[in-house]
């Protein structure tokens, strides 16, 4: 697919220029992607395929749910008959595959489910997409496939050394996707992004969990020492990265989507306490922190190079202070967008 077809403001008269399938579109990052596509590309039909798991919410899409170029289909990527029929009936041109089980803590107690959804489901989807001869297949992976590192920065050629069931399932799914390029020259592109934060994220992940705990006058639960660091990227920045890959990404390639902004979990908790509880006192901040048992494995860092996507013209734009303030405000008003969301605030999955 050329960049030109994404630059044209209008499609063919009486129809849509392209039909784009986004999997997991009621989830966190994919919902931001769908809103952007629906609003900015009115000549593209955006089809949201989601089975509506516990971490999904159609409220993430309320602003565009009645748009003429948006369609929601409830279904499971692991249902091969359904997926094949979907490609046949919807005449899909482009796939952005976000749908996955993503919570690392949960992957330790539901490893087989992660393998089934993330690996088998991806294989079902890429196979159906190949059979339907779609123009481009974007597989959304994670920096965690590299494993942790204290000093060495990972680039796209670094070996995959995942250390938890979630990362292992994403790495395995990458292998299936990449094999369709190697064997058939099917136009796949793989992305690996840093930790993304912002509105719409189910509060099992560290930033929305800490925000929600503090807003409910509960302590931040820190796994282990809390000295592990993560690179945080705002949701709208990662959407721009995916758009860049759609426009300019080369088939068969992998693109890291990272940021130099890095923060330890302890420092994250302190910053959120300062912003939400309005205190700079170290002793008062300690009163809002609860250290709990660590994960079975918990990588210290995921340092990652992103020069390759920089070469396509993308760089993150949203400063941390701006992004985190927007995120805090959103959770103040939208915490109950999910059913039984309170269970997400426990230190470990329940």
From Swiss-Prot:
UniProt organism field: Homo sapiens
Family label: Belongs to the NAD(P)-dependent epimerase/dehydratase family. dTDP-glucose dehydratase subfamily.
Residues noted as binding substrate in the record, renumbered to the chain: 142
UniProt keywords, alphabetically: Disease variant, Lyase, NAD
Gene Ontology terms: biological process: nucleotide-sugar metabolic process
Gene3D superfamilies according to UniProt: NAD(P)-binding Rossmann-like Domain (3.40.50.720), UDP-galactose 4-epimerase, domain 1 (3.90.25.10)
First-tier enzyme category under EC: lyase
Gene Ontology molecular-function annotations: dTDP-glucose 4,6-dehydratase activity
EC number: 4.2.1.46
UniProt cofactor(s): NAD(+)
Disease: Catel-Manzke syndrome: A syndrome characterized by Pierre Robin sequence and a unique form of bilateral hyperphalangy causing a clinodactyly of the index finger. Pierre Robin sequence includes an opening in the roof of the mouth (a cleft palate), a large tongue (macroglossia), and a small lower jaw (micrognathia).
Catalytic residues (positions): 143-144, 166
Protein's UniProt name: dTDP-D-glucose 4,6-dehydratase
Catalytic activity: dTDP-alpha-D-glucose = dTDP-4-dehydro-6-deoxy-alpha-D-glucose + H2O
């Amino acid at each position: 697919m050329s960049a030109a077809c994404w630059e044209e403001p209008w499609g063919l008269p009486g129809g849509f220029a392209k039909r784009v399938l986004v999997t997991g579109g009621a989830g966190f990052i994919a919902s931001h992607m769908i809103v952007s596509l629906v609003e900015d590309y009115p000549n593209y039909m955006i089809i949201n395929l989601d089975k509506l798991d516990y971490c999904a919410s159609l409220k993430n899409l309320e602003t565009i749910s009645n748009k003429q170029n948006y369609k929601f289909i409830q279904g499971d990527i692991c249902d091969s008959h359904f997926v094949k029929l979907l490609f046949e009936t919807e005449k899909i041109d482009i796939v952005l595959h976000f749908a996955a089980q993503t919570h690392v803590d949960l992957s330790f107690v539901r490893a087989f489910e992660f393998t089934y959804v993330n690996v088998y489901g991806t294989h079902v989807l890429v196979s159906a997409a190949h059979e339907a001869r779609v123009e481009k297949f974007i597989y959304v992976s994670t920096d965690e496939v590299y494993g942790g590192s204290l000093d060495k920065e990972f680039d796209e050629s670094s070996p995959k050394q995942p250390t938890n069931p979630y990362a292992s399932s994403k790495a395995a799914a990458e292998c299936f996707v990449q094999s369709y390029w190697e064997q058939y020259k099917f136009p796949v592109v793989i992305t690996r992004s840093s930790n993304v934060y912002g509105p719409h994220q189910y509060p099992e992940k560290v930033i929305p969990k800490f925000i929600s705990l503090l807003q409910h006058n509960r302590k931040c639960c820190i796994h282990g020492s809390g000295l592990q660091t993560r690179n945080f990227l705002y949701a709208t920045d990662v959407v721009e990265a995916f758009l860049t890959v759609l426009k300019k990404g080369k088939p068969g390639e992998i693109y890291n989507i990272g940021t130099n902004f890095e923060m330890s979990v302890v420092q994250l908790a302190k910053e959120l306490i300062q912003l939400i509880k309005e205190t700079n006192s170290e002793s008062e901040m300690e009163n809002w922190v609860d250290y709990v048992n660590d994960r079975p494995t918990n990588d210290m860092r995921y340092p990652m190079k992103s020069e390759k996507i920089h070469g396509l013209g993308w760089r993150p734009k949203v400063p941390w202070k701006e992004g985190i303030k927007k995120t805090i405000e959103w959770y103040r008003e939208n915490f109950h967008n999910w059913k039984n969301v309170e269970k997400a605030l426990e230190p470990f999955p329940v």
